[in-house]
Amino acid sequence: MDKTNSLSSCLSSPRCSVLANISGTDLYRDRKDYLHIFEPRGVKIFRIPSPIFFANIEFFKEKLQEAVGFNPLRVLRKRNKALRKIKKLLQENDNHSRDTGLRGLFSKTTDESCVNKEEMDQPTDLEGLPFRMNWNAELPSNISVPRVDLHSLILDFSAVSFLDISALKGLKAGLKEFIRIDVDVYIVSCDVYILEKLHMCMFFDDEIRTSMFFPTLHDAMLHVLEKHKEDKTKGWVISDTKM
């Protein structure tokens, strides 16, 4: 393999890593490389050490899904499918559903042959439900919605020096998949050039906002810990692996 092909291969298939905190410091390193390294429950820090462009954006998204342990789009579609069924049953028998709750609703079946895939990819609409929906609670046996224990995803962009239009579109779609299943997404250490490009290309909207960007990884982590104070009592995950 010549140098050009070798460089292309490295850029298109970079070594992505999951970071965690070295105890007692504001340093974050690959959790595979240390014996005693900590990460809060419900938080994942993902780093990609290269520019992002058309040739590696899908690789990046696949590695991110491997890191978090689930496909956010699949989760979103499952939730929307369940909500569609709930709302249809509420319309058919409102009083019965209020008396018997969620399990009573799912004792019936509905025709799902007319499911529109585009609708399934949209944000879940919980308005109008007579109960508070908790997707991580025990659900009826005839409904399968993957459990998501992740509440915060931090993306380390310190090595992302370039982002082309194709990658920008793919990144935006991928981030929305997480946001729509109630995972807070943060981007840290982003190059000023990249931020300017995001503004120019209309990257930001009602779902993806500038407030998700933090100057450093530790700043983002402090924000997450403050936002989820109640989770501190649940402790930290300790990694005992070493390369």
Report the location of each language-model feature.
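Short acidic-hydrophobic, aromatic-tinged amphipathic segments that line or gate anion-handling sites
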Residues: 206-224
